[in-house]
Amino acid sequence: MKVKLDIVSGFLGAGKTTLIKKLVTEGYRDEKIVVLENEFGKVGIDTDILKNTGVEVEEITAGCICCSSSGDFLSSIEDIINKFNPDRIIVEPTGVAKLSGILRACNDFKFKNLFKINNIISVLDVKRFDFVSSYSKVFVDDQIAVSKTIVLSKNTGVDIKYIEGMYSYIKNININANIINEDIYNISGRDLIEAIENKIQDYDMLNILDKLDRDETRNPYHFSTLEFKTKKSIDYSDIKLIFKCFEDEDTYGKIVRGKGILQNRDKNWYKFDYVENEINEESYYKEESGAICIIGYKLNKKNILNLFE
């Protein structure tokens, strides 16, 4: 029997890792699962978070699996199957991956007998949909166009008329999309799987990819990353002040995503997440050293690093 291959896509900070954690800890508990993580950069923060669930995690950090590292992606899938013999592989691409490019890579004839593409999921951040679309519409529309299921995340407190507008936007691009408008934190893993797998309408991947112009997925912004490890103790209050400084785009560039695992001055570890002027923290297990990853475009890395000194 072929290994099931699920792909969980979504822009930076949309909630991909949160969704995968829900699936592996609550939904697919009876299956042998391996997660293939394609981090944007070489500091695997999301990889460490997923490993903390007890699931096997492999990672690709050399590039994006939709383009420059597509060969590494397929080789990694083959290696995972040979090494772990899993029931299911869940792939989390980078937040700036073109989902259509990943699906095209999966159609490589040499690997057809190894796996079967099962769930193709994109996570959309409802609260920041307009913000993200303003500079990454090509990525967002590409993910919508080729997904089987769209999960609307971070939807608590959002006006129903706005969500209805998102439904219309999605259906205008992908009429057959299965849309899930549930709070990921409140829905059970089993109910989530049922909503994902039992409501898929007709899906012809080759036909969809043929209709999608490859040039349409080019993005005018060139995202870059600044990442580093540190043994310095940094309080969360200091992190909030640093990220407040990033509102000065002339000095630091446009910061669209930040995440890290750090130790505070009381020797307690915590994880922080930053997306569009909103930052939050949660406690974390002990690490050997802290790590920070900042993603954006036109980054002034020297000025950013000065804030952490």
Give short role names for the model-derived ranges.
Residues K2-S133:
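Nucleotide-state-sensitive switch-loop elements of NTP-binding domains
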Residues V34-L36, K259-L262, I294:
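Short, hydrophobic beta-strand segments that form beta-sheet elements in well-ordered domains
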Residues G290-G296:
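Short, well-ordered beta-strand elements
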Residues G101-I102, Y135-S136, Y162-M166:
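Residues at alpha-helix caps and immediate loop-helix transition turns in enzyme cores, especially N-
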Residues I90, V151, T225-E227, C293:
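Short aromatic/hydrophobic contact patches that present stacked aromatics
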Residues I120, T149-V151:
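Short, well-ordered beta-strand core segments
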Residues D142, V146-T149, G157-K286, K298-K302, ...:
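C-terminal accessory "lid"/substrate-recognition subdomains
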Residues D130, S134-V146:
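Flexible active-site lid/hinge loop adjacent to a nucleotide/diphosphate
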